């Protein structure tokens, strides 16, 4: 059960006595306690801080891990970017060392190298492992709901701010993340703006990449056929199979919704029929977590390979649930060699660096450098993603209200907080068609959706536009043509420019 937060952080960070089993309030360590040693087998970087920090008001043993990197350029000293990975249950070190941090594993390298496209070039960057049990975040009692996740994170931020010279108040704070952080970011932003009297965070904007901002159906099945029609030849889908998928799509009414979403301005809200993936959520969650590997499909590993099986799987599956266009398509595609749901351009030469990341951060000398253990302590292996957290938070009973329904419109309309959505066109897991329909179904600042279509080009690479964009009434949307689910990894230079010019407005 969630424990109410009783702690009020003051500048001296003094505390009341603890109640048995709970850290109702604690004396906070000094900032110097988190200074890191130089990472083994890695280039030297500017001053940084890392470690675990207890969550006030929760069970003793529940803490979040953080890593704060200094700004590399004094011209951007006023900026603080907070990065959250998704999953749910995936470590922020995935983002830090595989995407946008000062050090990154490049290609087949087993040791981190300097990242020329580090976001620390644009300000201080704070990476947080959350919720408890994620990455290096410790867990005594696991979280069971998004409400608990957000409450813990907000309470933790209060402690972090007290230790680090009120950095959340004095810097321009931008919260950025990807995938399931599309849930985390709007909810924590909402908590921040509504509780400014408790912690006056100088929150300037939020940005979400390939994020789960809408209902599950809208994020996956609703846009799948629209996505497949763009890339049918690249994906080598036979005509009869494509027709069968389109049959299921039409039977569920998704094609009609997509057509309505193409009308600018929209003529009214869309009803999202069906509940994709409700029958066997754990199996589907595992499938998404592991990139649709055969062994992860379990009892749902039916591999529909004929038009008849495709149609049946979409409209009558006892495993995936009704209107499972996405799950059926992903199951079919999993039989193709070297297919990746995260970026359909990844081929057989693509190397997944997750095992390298886990091996490096499972080293005792690395964990000692990060203030996570003493030389005599037992080693705790590092896990990039925790499947138990994914299963818990993705369970139908635990899913929060999609941010596009209420939270995002409130942030934009009531609190006038700039919201930036960025998306990789090659991402099949959370496809851009579904994202665009979700935006067009959202009402903010007096109107529904974008009033004009997505047609402005941005960026140039080899005489071609990097993508298309639109911005209206405080919401911007950027579609990157050649990127997938992990955009900072796929297009590091282009995304760095995007963060500088769009998110930071510099």
Swiss-Prot record:
SUPFAM superfamilies named in the record: alpha/beta-Hydrolases
Glycosylation sites: 108, 280, 316, 349, 441
Pfam families: Peptidase_S10 (PF00450)
GO molecular function: serine-type carboxypeptidase activity
Enzyme Commission number: 3.4.16.5
GO CC annotation terms, alphabetical: extracellular region
Compartments, as annotated in UniProt: Secreted
Entry keyword annotation includes Zinc: no
Domain of life assignment: Eukaryota
Signal sequence bounds: 1-15
Keywords: Carboxypeptidase, Glycoprotein, Hydrolase, Protease, Secreted, Signal
Annotated catalysed reactions: Release of a C-terminal amino acid with broad specificity
Chief site of localization: secreted
Annotated catalytic residues: 179, 427, 485
Gene Ontology BP annotations: proteolysis
Protein family per UniProt: Belongs to the peptidase S10 family.
Function: Involved in degradation of small peptides.
Name by which UniProt lists this protein: Carboxypeptidase Y homolog ARB_06361
């Amino acid at each position: 059960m969630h424990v109410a937060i009783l702690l009020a952080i003051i500048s001296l960070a003094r505390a009341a006595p603890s109640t048995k089993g709970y850290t109702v309030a604690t004396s906070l360590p000094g900032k110097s306690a988190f200074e890191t040693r130089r990472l083994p087998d890695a280039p030297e970087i500017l001053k940084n801080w890392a470690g675990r920090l207890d969550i006030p008001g929760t069970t003793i043993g529940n803490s979040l891990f953080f890593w704060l990197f200094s700004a590399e350029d004094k011209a951007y000293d006023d900026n603080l970017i907070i990065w959250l990975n998704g999953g749910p249950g995936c470590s922020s070190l995935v983002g830090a060392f595989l995407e946008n941090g000062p050090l990154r594993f490049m290609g087949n390298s087993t040791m981190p190298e300097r990242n020329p496209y580090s976001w620390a070039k644009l300000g201080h960057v704070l990476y947080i492992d959350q919720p408890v049990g994620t990455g290096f975040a410790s867990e005594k009692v696991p979280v069971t709901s998004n409400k608990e996740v957000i409450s813990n994170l907000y309470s933790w931020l209060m402690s972090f701010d007290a230790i680090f010279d009120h950095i959340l108040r004095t810097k321009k704070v931008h919260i950025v993340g990807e995938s399931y952080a599309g849930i985390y970011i709007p909810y924590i932003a909402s908590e921040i703006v509504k509780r400014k009297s408790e912690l006056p965070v100088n929150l300037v904007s939020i940005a979400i990449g390939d994020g789960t901002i809408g209902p599950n159906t809208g994020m996956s099945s609703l846009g799948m056929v629209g996505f497949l029609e763009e890339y049918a030849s690249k994906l080598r889908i036979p005509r009869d199979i494509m027709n069968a998928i389109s049959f299921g799509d039409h039977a569920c009414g998704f094609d009609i919704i997509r057509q309505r979403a193409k009308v600018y301005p929209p003529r009214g809200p869309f009803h999202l029929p069906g509940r994709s993936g409700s029958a066997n959520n754990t199996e589907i969650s595992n499938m998404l977590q592991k990139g649709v590997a055969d062994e992860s499909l379990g009892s749902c590993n039916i591999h529909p390979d004929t038009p008849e099986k495709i149609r049946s799987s979409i409209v009558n599956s006892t495993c995936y649930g009704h209107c499972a266009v996405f799950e059926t398509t992903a199951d079919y595609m999993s039989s193709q060699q070297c297919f990746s749901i995260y970026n359909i351009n990844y081929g057989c030469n693509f190397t997944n660096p997750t095992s390298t990341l886990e091996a490096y951060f499972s080293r005792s000398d690395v964990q000692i450098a990060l203030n996570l253990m003493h030389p005599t302590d037992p080693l705790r292996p590092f896990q990039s993603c925790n499947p138990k957290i994914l299963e818990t938070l993705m369970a139908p009973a635990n899913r929060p209200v999609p941010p596009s329904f209420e939270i995002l419109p409130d942030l934009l309309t009531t609190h006038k907080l700039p919201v930036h959505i960025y998306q990789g066109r090659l991402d099949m897991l959370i496809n851009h068609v579904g994202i665009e329909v979700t935006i067009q179904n959202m009402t903010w600042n007096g109107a529904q959706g974008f009033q004009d279509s997505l047609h402005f080009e941005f960026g140039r690479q080899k005489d071609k536009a990097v993508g298309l964009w639109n911005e209206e009434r405080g919401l911007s949307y950027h579609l990157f043509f050649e990127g997938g689910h992990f955009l900072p990894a796929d297009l590091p230079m282009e995304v760095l420019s995007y963060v500088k010019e769009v998110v930071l407005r510099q």
